[in-house]
Amino acid sequence: MTPAERLRALADADDPLVLPGVYDGLSARLARQAGFDALVVSGYSVSAARLGLPDFGYLSQIEMVDAARDLIAAVPGTPVVVDADTGYGNALSAARTARLLHAAGAAGMILEDQQWPKRCGHMEGKRITDRADWLAKIRAVVDLREEGIDMFLIARTDARGVEGLDEAIARAREAATLGADAVFVEAPVDAAEMRRVAGDLADARPVANMVEGGRTPLMPAPELAALGYRVVLWGITGILAAGHALRGAYAALAATGSGPDPSALMTFDEITDAVGLPDHRRLDERYSG
């Protein structure tokens, strides 16, 4: 079974596939150790952590591929979906992005219909491409399966905030017809819209995106499953938690000249264990003179 096939099986299981957002090797390992079967690389999070910049079109194709490659290597055997933004160009660019991500070990990708430079789907000022342009990108990535480049493709549309929910659902439906594995209508604004998206796209593996502080109401996985969602993204939870913890630790250090209360920190050994030091010690002993 390929990594993409594993994701399809997980998405079709009794419970929805919940994907926590990760952005580096440590976050990926901690999410995996928490018990998640698969992960998603969040563009919002990588842009913040790697560049110190907002999700505003700054993160390049190669920067995202490099970030994905590093964290995928930290969790071997774990299916990872990567936020590929707009595919970084036209249909040919989207196909090249898929090739690069597949070579980096990714099991899937998210491909959206914003114009470049794109921005976070829960920000103002989004612009979307013509439907035909986006669908050409979807088709280009799907066609790679004929070459053995099988990606679990999540087709994301931001049309809800630009042209309305009807257009967003129509775009998602066409993407599914072309072979997208799951469809992602970004930023429905209330429970009624959430129900409609899940109902109208029930046969297309609808995706729910839970963004703390965003436009969409937050719902736990069981409620989303009852509506019919098959994939649930919590893409920025990790970076929000990390940012909060780091800001508090640095503020305490700056204010007191000493670190925060130890109860607010992982221990030295907890971190080294989380990144696999015991395994590396065993390897070192095995290969030492």
Residue ranges and their predicted role:
Residues 1-2, 289:
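Short, low-complexity, intrinsically disordered N-terminal peptides in bacterial proteins
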Residues 143, 237-289:
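Extended, intrinsically disordered, low-complexity segments
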